[in-house]
Amino acid sequence: MTIKSNTPSHDKDCWQTPLWLFDALDIEFGFWLDSAASDKNALCAHWLTEADDALNSEWVSHGAIWNNPPYSNIRPWVEKAAEQCIQQRQTVVMIVPEDMSVGWFSKALESVDEVRIITDGRINFIEPSTGLEKKGNSKGSMLLIWRPFISPRRMFTTVSKAALMAIGQGVRRAA
């Protein structure tokens, strides 16, 4: 059975990562650049928009790079992340649907250091038209993590949604 999205086509590739999730990962990685953002949903002090044409640009960064790619076409983003990790000498972290049966996942395994599966719940992304988290994600999520200076280990690790939420919400409360 195929699950179809009810999201309007103009919003399909514009969903924002929830702040609690980004904050939890930012503590670990120290993000400097959001390489797939809009002026409305950028999560870092520096970001690339559709107008910047991130797939044909250098991801110049002085810290780790965050990427929540358009889910309609993930493969070119996987290829670019692998390239830019080496060229920029920065860690790249990408959030993607947890689907290991697709071609882009096999491509990622050629270069990724870590596949971190988010367990115990699905991520509710921020809907572009409302700015609110929306339930009903049809798949779980995982993180693809490229690290420079090491041979890719292709590690599979897990982290629970609850653990990430506790860390990320703690950051917001402390701020």
Named regions from a protein language model:
Residues 1-175:
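Class I S-adenosyl-L-methionine-dependent methyltransferase catalytic core
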